[in-house]
Amino acid sequence: MNDSRYIGRFAPTPSGFLHFGSLVAALASWLDARAVNGRWLLRVEDTDPPREMPGARDAILQTLERYGLEWDGEVVFQSQRHPAYAQVVDRMFNMGLAYACTCSRKQLEGYNGIYPGFCRNAGHAREGAAIRLRVPELIYRFTDRVQGTFQQHLGREVGDFVIQRRDGLYAYQLAVVLDDAWQGVTDIVRGADLLDNTPRQLYLQELLGFSQPRYLHIPLIVQPDGHKLGKSYRSPPLEASQATPLLLRALRALGQEADPQLLTATPAEVLAVARQRWQPEAIAQRTTVPEADLY
């Protein structure tokens, strides 16, 4: 199959080094793009400087290169996109689609992450406040290529959500939607932990007149205690010397054929074979896969 219109992306955060869970996500999005001769973009989501680890940006790029996951075009850094985000936040605020919120974390305790609307009609000034987007009392639903139909009532299950924090930093939901549209992304392949973020992004896309990408949410790799592999749980960083065996293990996590004879192959050779054999329909329709099952 050949679809030169396909544009995918991998968007890591530089809060730490890439780990095995990152590799599975990167590999899935890379293969989905390359299998149809599409483009694969790299975007570093560095919108939260306090959480950024020194040296992580360069390490992420180097690791992807050593694992053979080459991207198209220039790397985009979200920290360079602030003027675009500011313009949209200003427009939404001035149109009454968003409002200033002065609620503290303590005030919101006990609401299970669902904003109760305390500041919705308060008319607070913007200075020193977060900016929340008003959400409709509607159900947003989409069909994921692996997980099937997913739906969420934005008003009841999320509430008005933050698009700019009180410290001035821009929220993930806003930045990801603006950047995917700006880069012309047609297909988003990412971890199932972001499945319930998607309806908020669909609403933003609708509000801003953007087309909706196709979505594919892969199972998360989890540790024995059920936590996903991640920087906050000190998952070991990827080592260049282990590229081939880890790529093969990542293929197994995605339900793909991982020929043991490729253990002596280079990362580029493993990827060339995997690209030809890519079958997204073989990915398990589940949200987690225990890491122990992959050995």
Curated annotation (Swiss-Prot):
A motif ('HIGH' region) lies at residues 12-22. InterPro entries: Glu-Q_tRNA(Asp)_Synthase (IPR022380), Glu/Gln-tRNA-synth (IPR000924), Glu/Gln-tRNA-synth_Ib_cat-dom (IPR020058), GluQ/Sye (IPR049940), Rossmann-like_a/b/a_fold (IPR014729). This is Glutamyl-Q tRNA(Asp) synthetase. Zn(2+) binds at residues 101, 103, 115, 119. ATP binds at residue 231. Its cofactor is Zn(2+). It comes from Pseudomonas putida (strain W619). Its EC number is 6.1.1.-. One of its GO terms (molecular function) is ATP binding. One of its GO terms (biological process) is glutamyl-tRNA aminoacylation. The keyword Signal does not apply.
